[in-house]
Amino acid sequence: MTSYIFVLLVGLVAGCVSGVIGTGSSIMLLPVLVFSFGPKQAVPIMAIAAVMANVARVAAWWREVDWRAFAAYALPGAPAAALGARTLLVLPPRVIDVALGLFFLSMIPGRRWLARRNFRIRLWQLAIAGAAIGFLTGVVLSTGPLSVPAFTAYGLSMGAFLSTEAASSLALYISKVVTFRELGALPPSTILQGMIVGASLMVGAFVAKRAVLRMSRALFQHLLDGLMLCSGLSLLWAALE
């Protein structure tokens, strides 16, 4: 019972964080889920919780979703996520952790360099990013920070970024959950645990909306940089252990 209470509290905080900066809940919750339920159950539990969290973020920012960007990203990304989930056990996770960690760290100065040059990507480039990130989403637990440079380079920010990223991630995670179900990795107990964790993330997402509405664009960008710094360092740390 104590472990469930702790998971729910961390989930509420993680929901608030991801509701403000668009991602990060998986990174915050993973150690807690592994400790409470074991590593085998942690990934499918987080996948179900992520579906619920993204539903809440889409509902909170429904009117600001960029549906063209969503379609360009999610249509190639969803089948790629299913393919990634099927190859989860084939690729060495340590190599992936190192590569993603270095990428996140490099994108902190990289995003600022691109912003100074007013770099923008088009819909077809966003579709390529969706396919690549979708595949990685199927392979590893969290690739949320990867979508940050993709959607911001397309020109989205604040509510439009949060809602469109959430809608796109929702499509990818549904594909991943369906694949887990087909592979027999989602017994009823795991589904229930995922829904309990997801409920706390949903509450946090709605709480965070007020903070975003009062936030300046500069502070929002600083928070994104902070997330990528923490994400990159945590992945490199995991790879070294």
What are these model-predicted stretches?
Residues G22, G38, P92-I96, S157, ...:
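A helix-boundary/kink motif common to multi-pass secondary transporters
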Residues N54-W62, A85, P93, A99-W124, ...:
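Transmembrane helix exit motif
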Residues A85-R94, F180-L192, A239-E241:
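Membrane-interface helix termini and inter-helical loops of multi-pass transporters
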Residues P31-V32, S36-K40, L75-L83, M107, ...:
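Small-residue-rich segments of transmembrane alpha-helices in multi-pass membrane proteins
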Residues Y4, A47, L100-F104, I108, ...:
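Residues within membrane-spanning alpha-helices of integral membrane proteins
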Residues A205-M228:
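Interfacial loop-to-transmembrane junctions
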Residues Y4-A72, A129-G134, S142-L201, A205, ...:
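Small-residue-rich hydrophobic segments that form or flank transmembrane alpha-helices
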Residues D66-G77, D97-G101, I121-G130, A160-A167, ...:
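Cytoplasmic-side transmembrane-helix entry/capping segments in multi-pass membrane proteins
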